Swiss-Prot record:
The lineage of its organism: Eukaryota, Viridiplantae, Streptophyta, Embryophyta, Tracheophyta. SMART domains: BRLZ (SM00338). Residues 135-144 have a biased composition (Polar residues). Belongs to the bZIP family. Residues 185-230 form the bZIP domain. This is Transcription factor TGAL9. The keyword Chloroplast does not apply. Residues 148-159, 176-188 have a biased composition (Basic and acidic residues). It comes from Oryza sativa subsp. japonica (Rice). GO terms for molecular function: DNA-binding transcription factor activity; sequence-specific DNA binding.
């Protein structure tokens, strides 16, 4: 009971060490006492076969200390204390504390040796008298040591449990990191579906655009072929040299006018030949034959005038497309071009008729 004030001043780490040393001292004391009991057992036996009460007390104390030591060892779990409840690097104890710890560690051994020596020297009556104080003192100190051991075991259990929880959380986080890719949620799936639909529509639009381009190209080639065919047909209608003249540098309208004018000149020459023949065949004397010849000549003159109207229409048509070709006079025959070069004017229809 005299050791309790300085025990309360120790730090938790020192208290735990002190409790462990006290327990070890008690075990050594009990073992020494039990050895002395067994050594003197044969000598102390009375003729009646009974044992001394002090010896029984020492035996019970030894058995209780063995049970408590085994229970304290079993209560400590065989686990790795990752997060200890006590600081790992405690401060250095003071010289006073170190001396007190040395005194604590040496006191149980000295007490055990003294008790063993006294029990071997004293008679049975003195041993019985000396056994009573040990029975009164040791059980009072034993519960405090066992209580401290229990508290330390509980603290270790709590620390081990906390470390296990932290270790479990770390292992679960590592397992979640090493797991495969998680399945996407509904929002991601909806976005992926929208992207696929947009890509499909884009491909369809591109295909339709390409088809339109191909159709336009085919239509353009068809129009070009139709235009070439029409040009060839028109050239065949206008004359053999019309299309070649148009290719040589003239416009299509100028080439068409040249062809039409060439045909008009041919028909005009035939009409002029018929008119000359009618004039020559006209009779000198009047009569029925003279009246018929005059009527025929009038018809030929009316046809020639109408034929000149066709030429005017042709000139009007080409003037709206290529007036410079009409003014230059390249479409005229060589004789008319000569008159234009000499006099700077165009011969009248009267000169044409007369010639």
């Amino acid at each position: 009971m005299g050791d309790r004030p300085w025990q309360q001043q120790l730090q938790p780490h020192d208290q735990q060490a002190a409790s462990c040393s006290v327990t070890a001292g008690m075990m050594m004391q009990a073992s020494a006492t039990s050895s002395s009991i067994h050594g003197n057992n044969i000598i102390r036996k009375d003729p009646g076969g009974g044992y001394d009460m002090a010896e029984l007390d020492h035996i019970f104390l030894y058995l209780n200390s063995q049970d408590q030591a085994s229970a304290a060892i079993q209560e400590q779990p065989q686990t790795l204390n990752i997060f200890p409840s006590q600081p790992m690097h405690a401060g250095e104890p003071s010289p006073k504390g170190s001396s007190s710890m040395a005194a604590i560690n040496s006191a149980p051994s000295n007490n055990a040796l003294a008790i063993a020596a006294g029990s071997s020297k004293r008679p049975p009556a003195a041993a019985a008298a000396g056994g009573q104080p040990s029975r009164l003192n040791n059980p009072a100190d034993q519960p405090s040591a066992s209580g401290k051991d229990g508290k330390a075991a509980v603290v270790k259990k709590e620390g081990g449990g906390g470390g296990g929880k932290h270790h479990g959380g770390a292992s679960s986080a590592a397992a979640s990191e090493h797991e495969g890719p998680k399945t996407p949620d509904a929002k991601t799936l909806r976005r992926l579906a929208q992207n696929r639909e947009a890509a499909r529509k884009s491909r369809l639009r591109k295909k339709a655009y390409i088809q339109n381009l191909e159709t336009s190209r085919i239509r353009l080639s068809q129009l070009e072929q139709e235009l070439v065919q029409r040009s060839r047909t028109q050239g065949a209608i206008l004359g053999g040299g019309a299309f070649s003249a148009g290719i040589g540098g003239q416009s299509p309208e100028a080439a068409w006018f040249d062809g039409e004018y060439a045909r008009w000149v041919e028909s005009h020459e035939r009409m002029m030949a018929h008119m000359r023949a009618a004039v020559e065949e006209q009779p000198q004397h009047g009569g029925v034959a003279a009246a018929a010849a005059e009527a025929q000549l009038r018809q030929l003159v009316d046809a020639a005038v109408a034929h000149h109207g066709v030429l005017v229409e042709l000139k009007a048509a080409v003037a709206s497309a290529d007036v410079f070709h009409l003014v230059s006079g390249t479409w005229l025959p060589a004789a008319e071009r000569c008159f234009l070069w000499i006099g700077g004017f165009r011969p009248s229809e009267l000169i044409k008729v007369s010639t």
